[in-house]
Amino acid sequence: MLFRSPSLIVQHRDRPGVIAQVTDILADRGVNICNFSLSRRQKGGEAVMTIEMDGGLDEILAARIRALPAVLLCVMLLP
């Protein structure tokens, strides 16, 4: 996959509300999501979010997402 926009790869536990927690952090900073995907192998296991955005990605934002209890890994990709 080629990332043309600032992006996050977020590995997390598959639990209710995790997507909302991550997207709330983005919304609080005024970040617009231009592409989003989620994949998992089994219900309740681990999942991976791929989020492309229209700018606004920085280390402070990524650190807030990393601090969420269900997040296992958060990687920033800058074009």
Where are these regions (language model features)?
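A conserved regulatory-domain signal marking ACT and ACT-like small-molecule sensing domains
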Residues: 1-79
